[in-house]
Amino acid sequence: MDYVTLGRTGLRVSVAGLGCGGFSQLGLAQGKSEADAIAIIRQALGLGVNLFDTADAYGTEGVLGKAIKSVRREDVVICTKAPFSFSNPHSTSEGIVASLDKSLRQLDTDYIDVYQLHGVPPGAYDHALSDLAPVLLREKEKGKFCYLGITETAPHDREHQTLNRAAQDGVWDVVMVGFHMMHQNARDRVFPLTRANRVGTLLMFAVRNIFSQPERLRSTLRDLAAAGEVPQSFADPPDPLAFLIHDDGASTVPDAAYRFVRHEPGVDVVLFGTGDPAHLRTNIASILKPPLPEPDRAQLSALFGHLVGVGLDAPHLSRPRR
């Protein structure tokens, strides 16, 4: 495993982080048992993963808490998030402390490494900054968590308005950002600011459905070709990203997707989710591979660098927030 320093936190974290939500929720969303989910977490630990991202909304805090009992607490970096109910301009600051305490109980831990506000839309950012952050920072002083973070609502903030501000405000130590081969605008909107201000980054949406389901990729590119957003050659090819798969390049489209984001300047940790032991191994292996060949990266930028908001399907962010 490779490790990096997570922004100004000083935390040494694995470049591959296991996400405990998404469409899999450690396999629980596909009917797997709690024991199976615990086994996935412990397999990840065995492969060198030390950063785990969960949330109240995922229902996996308790599972993560049980799984990490097999290691020393200081050897694991726990990132979790407040309920979505606080990611609106009408939420109250009083309840956020109770939610933090609830996460501590469910994780069965004395402290959380990174506590994040979850999916904050641009219209709620001022409330998050002025009303919620000061309350949470007082709880930080009590030792309940170490660093404060914020995540964007990627499907409904395609221009990264929330993180563009958060990266400059000096309050948030860590941000979670959506970035992938067909949604690249964080390169200009977010990463220069996080790098300049030493804000740690957790990367989401590296693969999701668009790069793991061939028909989803084909249908998306057909629609984009019909709209004139990509060349007509993408209108109906059987394998539209075949140019990435070759002896010196990627082995699969998901492999290409992970390697594309992993080596983007400004990305600290690439989050991935799975409930399948084989997928866990292959995902980590892809994240640890070298960058894609420069001609392939250049072609991805030329073909898709102008696209915004493609492939940002998210189970917990299905409704717009203002």
For the regions a protein language model found, what residue spans apply to each?
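Conserved, mostly hydrophobic/aromatic
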Residues: 6, 18, 37, 44, ...
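Glycine/proline-rich, positively charged
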Residues: 26, 42, 88-189, 199-202
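Structured C-terminal cap/extension of enzyme domains
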Residues: 45, 189-322
